[in-house]
Amino acid sequence: MSEQKLSDNERLKAESNFLRGTIELDLKNDLTGGFTGDNFQLIRLHGMYQQDDRDIRAERAQQKLEPLHNVMLRARMPGGIITPEQWLGIDKFAHDHTMYGSIRLTTRQTFQFHGVLKPNIKMMHQTLNKYGIDSIATAGDVNRNVLCTSNPVESELHQEAYEWAKKISEHLLPKTRAYAEIWLDGEKLGPDEEPILGSTYLPRKFKTTVVIPPHNDIDVHANDLNFVAIAEDGKLVGFNVLVGGGLAMTHGNKETFPRKADDFGFIRKEDTLKFAEAVVTTQRDWGNRVNRQNAKTKYTLERVGVDAFKAEVEKRTGIKFEESRPYVFTSRGDRFGWVEGIDGKQHLTLFIENGRILDFPGKPLKTGLAEIAKIHKGDFRMTANQNLIIAGVPKKDKAKIEKIARAHGLIDDAITEQRKNSMACVALPTCPLAMAEAERFLPAFTTQIEAVMAKHGLADDHVIFRVTGCPNGCGRAMLAEIGLVGKAMDRYNFYIGGNREGTRIPRQYRENITSAEILKEIDALLGRWAKERNENEGFGDFVIRAGIVKPVVDSAKDFYAA
């Protein structure tokens, strides 16, 4: 690969002085609300994306104004656990210093601030730091926020899995002091080293999870590296290691495709960090730094072969993978309402549509959560399905917390199973990559699907339905039973045939069709499912069995097959 010209991102990282660039100078430049040159990309490795409000972009251009530049920040919260004190801190910042006033829970099991203007950026990082939160490496060519199954019931096993998620996150973090120097006025302490990530970091983004079967809420096949918890007598003994999943693709480029992760085998829990490091450094050294569209771990595995990659990981750790231990996934959705943990503590899972926490007319969700945070003695847990768990509630506080939640629209008994199993990425107006609506499209379209479900006698059932505004895959549509991927305004590619467990990639059924056309297709398909399904057969399994689409078995070979 060395004879070929490296992608420009490789130059940018190499010249960045360990991610510093000239960000500090840019912060002082008040001629533009944005970041210039390389800094536009470099801020991603500090957890931010430069965006603008696309709803008013044309209007501002007419007024000879630049786009309304702002940043989106994604916090680093391994396992998604946040204390009530931290919650009140981010609630206040979102209200006082963001354009939209909201907290957005994301599929990366963390929160995002949208619409932070340049004069507030440094203060934002300092505010987060005051509450023990940072945004290091939540974007860019690094290991991103580490996910962990939200399972408050099995409290002991979950706690240990969560501790490993935190340890993995810390171990794989960039070691540069650039973040502390720029945002927290940290001391400049001499030369930096990056023993794991290297001076040019990874070829592309890298996503890691810790998952506790039978619950696949974090969608293992969407991630580069997964540690599947294996327990004996309720105690964690180790992990099966799954490598090379990922959902992003590029419209029109058949060299890009979603891919499921491969099971490399079982490891003892004490070897977890060694294996995490070995997988990351193998991808660091073997990944494609010429073509970013083929730079992720999934493409490295396709190019060099699973066996060669696995052997290199074993060589770097000095430990052989053991044979995989058996496990099964049975579900992905969150368990809404109250559940009791084995420790007797109560846990309340709240459905937050699209993860958008804001005071809506008649549903002051943001105020309600702040009121709960003021009295709650446990913690909050963000889920990878964009919902929120009020965890560790003592029995005596249960009624009080439920009363606040109901008064603020945080509990709604009328929400259907279909709505609970529908999800979208942010898309317009803030995401610069969005080709179509997703978050703003989902609620009303889900209402239309609910009507179709009721018409066919399926009102109590559900289909895993997901929408992404572009093919990058943040909403994980490529693991849905019905997935829509944006192509243009009100036009989507329409995929069917994933399964409820999240272990099969769907296939394209129709290309570039409108939402009205999609609804007609869904009506016909759900009608057949209602009449012809086997007992308890999910929609995705039905469309495969009925021959409506062929299953995607090996996506590198058959994802684009007719």
From Swiss-Prot:
Gene Ontology CC annotations of this record: sulfite reductase complex (NADPH)
Origin: domain of life: Bacteria
Coiled-coil ranges (or none): none
GO molecular function, one term: NADP binding
Catalytic activity: hydrogen sulfide + 3 NADP(+) + 3 H2O = sulfite + 3 NADPH + 4 H(+)
Keywords annotated in UniProt: 4Fe-4S, Amino-acid biosynthesis, Cysteine biosynthesis, Heme, Iron, Iron-sulfur, Metal-binding, NADP, Oxidoreductase
Enzyme Commission no: 1.8.1.2
Family: Belongs to the nitrite and sulfite reductase 4Fe-4S domain family.
Protein name: Sulfite reductase [NADPH] hemoprotein beta-component
Species the sequence originates in: Tolumonas auensis (strain DSM 9187 / NBRC 110442 / TA 4)
